[in-house]
């Protein structure tokens, strides 16, 4: 397995230490090792027992590793980004695809919804109420959708989610850009 949460680490897992606004994952490397981590990855620390990234982002590496670990994904995945309209567009896509006879899903603010021509099933909501799920939740969810024979998925791709590499490792077949306004410009300096 792969995780950025030391509490979720099991035997022979890869632990990726991510530095966030409030926590530094490198402070949890020892706990991850005690829990069975085979390998720990971190940015900018000097420790001969840790694989240190000299360049690049631990967030990016984490998402790419998850994409390899959860390799099964639906055939058609589109990302929808923009200041406004992401939720509406992913919902419209899911509904249109279902009417065309494809088993479809949407992921984002409203949770994960699977739709067939006969019913809608909402079965997951992001633990953190994020528009774009954290990479571990996103990749597990895509793997789960594949196992439920979903062929088409529309994902809300927030600007924060894109910037934080949450969608890396997802094999997107298309993208939609809705619009751009001044929201979030404080984040994207």
Regions found by a protein language model. Name each.
Residues 61-189:
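Phosphate-binding loop of NTP-binding sites
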């Amino acid at each position: 397995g792969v995780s950025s949460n030391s509490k979720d680490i099991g035997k022979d897992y890869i632990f990726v230490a991510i530095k966030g606004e409030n926590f530094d994952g490198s402070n949890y490397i020892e706990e991850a090792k005690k829990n069975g981590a085979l390998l720990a990855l971190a940015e900018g620390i000097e420790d001969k027992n840790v694989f240190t990234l000299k360049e690049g982002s631990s967030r990016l590496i984490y998402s790419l590793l998850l994409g390899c670990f959860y390799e099964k994904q639906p055939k058609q995945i589109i990302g929808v980004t923009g200041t406004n309209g992401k939720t509406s567009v992913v919902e419209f896509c899911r509904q249109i695809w279902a009417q065309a006879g494809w088993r479809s899903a949407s992921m984002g603010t409203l949770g994960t919804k699977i739709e067939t021509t006969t019913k809608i099933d909402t079965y997951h909501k992001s633990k953190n109420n994020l528009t774009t799920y954290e990479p571990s939740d996103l990749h597990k969810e895509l793997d789960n959708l594949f196992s439920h024979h979903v062929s088409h998925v529309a994902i809300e791709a927030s600007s924060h989610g894109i910037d934080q590499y949450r969608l890396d490792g997802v094999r997107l077949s298309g993208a939609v850009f809705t619009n751009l306004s001044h929201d979030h410009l404080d984040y994207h300096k």
